[in-house]
């Protein structure tokens, strides 16, 4: 079991010295392998957008200092988030665009920047053609799947509380949209697992070890 810790954009209005101190303490835990979810959410706007940007920028800087990858929650804000990442600089440890549900035109500049992307149950939905088209185009080395638990259960389990075991349905749909069959299908499953392990099942960083 590994840990991701970060201040979600919904709660960005609470960013301040005390919150940063608590986050840094969590990141020093050697089980922590990622800083996230962080980013921008313009759909709900539960925190003012200026607070979202302030917290986002601060946490990207901390991730770079700590040598950890970032996991990004971006909703209806991909252009602004991309501009911020370009301005702050991409963490060398990597970047994961969490639970992508948009089209290839939105995703392409993130892929070009080297960001990995995860697809959840929405990949299986009837109205998910644009998501499937995007998933078919992503280079294999940048692909992952996830659950977004407890939300977004994939077909045929829509309406249930999502759980990690359900990722197999999303992974199967991913193989389908990429036309992978037989050994190619198994190789894709192995690659998706390897991508996740290499990014998230990482040894402690020098920063975490106090070096």
Show where each model-derived region lies.
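Conserved, mostly hydrophobic/aromatic
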Residues: 3, 37, 63, 98, ...
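Active-site environment of divalent metal-dependent phosphoester hydrolases
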Residues: 10-12, 41-43, 75-82, 101-108, ...
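Active-site gating/metal-coordination segments in enzymes
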Residues: 1-69, 113-116, 121-126
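Short helix-capping segments at alpha-helix termini
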Residues: 31, 65, 87-93, 113, ...
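Residue-level marker for buried hydrophobic side chains located in beta-strands
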Residues: 34, 70, 95, 143-145
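Mid-to-C-terminal alpha-helical segments outside catalytic/metal-binding sites
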Residues: 62, 167-211
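Short acidic/histidine-rich active-site segments
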Residues: 141-163
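Distinct, well-ordered alpha-helical segments
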Residues: 16, 23-24, 74-89, 96-97, ...
């Amino acid at each position: 079991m590994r840990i991701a810790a970060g201040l979600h954009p919904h709660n960005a209005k609470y960013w301040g010295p005390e919150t940063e101190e608590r986050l840094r303490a969590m990141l020093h835990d050697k089980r922590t392998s990622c800083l996230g979810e962080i980013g921008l959410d313009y759909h709900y706007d539960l925190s003012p957008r200026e607070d979202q940007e302030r917290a986002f920028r601060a946490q990207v800087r901390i991730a770079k200092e700590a040598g950890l990858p970032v996991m990004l929650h971006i909703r209806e804000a991909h252009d602004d988030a991309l501009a911020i990442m370009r301005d702050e600089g991409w963490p060398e440890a990597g970047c994961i665009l969490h639970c992508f549900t948009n089209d290839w035109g939105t995703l392409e500049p993130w892929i070009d920047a080297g960001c990995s992307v995860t697809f959840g149950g929405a990949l299986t939905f009837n109205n998910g053609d644009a998501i499937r088209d995007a998933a078919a185009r992503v280079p294999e080395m940048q692909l992952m799947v996830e659950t977004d638990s407890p939300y977004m259960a994939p077909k045929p389990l829509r309406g249930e509380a999502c759980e990690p075991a359900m990722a197999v349905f999303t992974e199967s749909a991913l193989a389908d949209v990429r036309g992978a069959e037989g050994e190619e299908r198994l190789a894709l499953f192995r690659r998706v697992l390897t991508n996740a392990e290499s990014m998230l099942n990482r040894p402690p960083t020098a920063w975490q070890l106090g070096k």
